[in-house]
Amino acid sequence: MKTVAIVGSQWGDEGKGKVIDYLATQADVVVRGQGGNNAGHTLVVEGKKYALHLIPSGVLNPNTVNIIGNGIVFDPKGFLEELEMFKTDNISTENIKISDRAHVIFPYHKELDALSEEARGDLKIGTTKKGIGPCYMDKTERSGIRICDLMDKDKFAIKLKAQIDAKNEIVKNIYGKEELFDFETIYNEYLGYAEQIRKYVADTSVIVYDAVRAGKKVLFEGAQGTLLDLDLGTYPFVTSSHPTSGGFAIGAGIGPNMIKDVVGIVKAYTTRVGEGPFVTEQINETGDKIREQGHEFGVTTGRPRRCGWFDAVIVKYAARVNGLTSISFMLLDVLTGFDKIKVCTSYKMGDKIITDFPASLDDLAKCEPVYEELDGWNEDITQIDNFDDLPENAKKYVAKIEELVGVSVDMVSVGPNRAQTIIRRNIFA
């Protein structure tokens, strides 16, 4: 089997898009199987930037089939807006397939997302207000509307009417809102979407399964990151899906034994968006410098990301829960110009040293980083394409990460463009 899963191994925003785009040029099939358009990643090809939220990264390769799997919560309006971006540049989108089992996001999901976040007050969790959580709630409550329902206008009308009646009761009685959702408006809007996406809809599980069985190269594209996983992340400051390797198989509609390699995407430092404890966060000039040099602002929200030093406790945890077989080390060039670079090797909580990532956020908030300090480098590394040509201190930094995490670094990124990538092992080989 030639199947590779790409997993964000921190809090997301690690640079997955670049790695996925790089590997997508070799892949026959690219699959997204969790989350929705709350996640964003940017592809840079020949100086042109494409901000993707729903569409898999293989769309730029006309020979690659791009799957939006059953584990996705699908915003048809957002999807069609992304399509326009490619049509403007005359890029074909005929290679996209949408699972008929994917659940659909509606306006009431987005409104309830915003109302719920507002009602939390000081306990807000930092939602993107894209309706992701409420849509997954309907899914687990077994009242959600799927793509296959949307394709049948009569069945869709019955299900939508029931949902709008229920959501209007919530909006009116819990949140005290007088402006309610109108069935006819939403029904007609989504019938229009249904006709526009109909040609893309398929049983994508069959497509992925057949591709794997045929020995084709299949790339599973993760969104967000391990520490945002609903079960394994920094709960409750997490997403509503499973952006870990275990969730990818379910979201693609195949068995877990069909994913051979799991590549962890890891930044050379650490960032986070939203609320929650962040042990190595630098609320100082160091954090500001990382943010400015790394252009650390969210693709989807534009929010400035919180920045800090590399945290080996986090990445070692990600290696364990994902079964990482390889690491792609991203944004190494951002650390150029730092005299000293710190790496968090463990946590100190009271008089105890902790090497495993704690479940309790109260415990995590009490933790202080235990750092090992390494010498930095000043040389420009953005044009280097051979690992041996990196500055000695940069190579030592990568070696230290491998030592602490216990997984080999097989790819190193030294700039945003596809060409600015150092390959130490061909992951699809």
From Swiss-Prot:
Binding site for Mg(2+): 13, 40
Cofactor(s) this protein requires: Mg(2+)
UniProt key word Nucleotide-binding: yes
GO annotations of cellular component type: cytoplasm
UniProt subcellular location: Cytoplasm
Biological or metabolic pathway of the protein: Purine metabolism; AMP biosynthesis via de novo pathway; AMP from IMP: step 1/2
GO molecular function, one term: magnesium ion binding
Gene3D superfamilies with a match to the protein in the record: Adenylosuccinate Synthetase, subunit A, domain 1 (3.40.440.10), Adenylosuccinate Synthetase, subunit A, domain 2 (1.10.300.10), Adenylosuccinate Synthetase, subunit A, domain 3 (3.90.170.10)
Similarity remark: Belongs to the adenylosuccinate synthetase family.
Function: Plays an important role in the de novo pathway of purine nucleotide biosynthesis. Catalyzes the first committed step in the biosynthesis of AMP from IMP.
UniProt name for this protein: Adenylosuccinate synthetase
Annotated organism of origin: Clostridioides difficile (strain 630) (Peptoclostridium difficile)
UniProt lineage: Bacteria, Bacillati, Bacillota, Clostridia, Peptostreptococcales
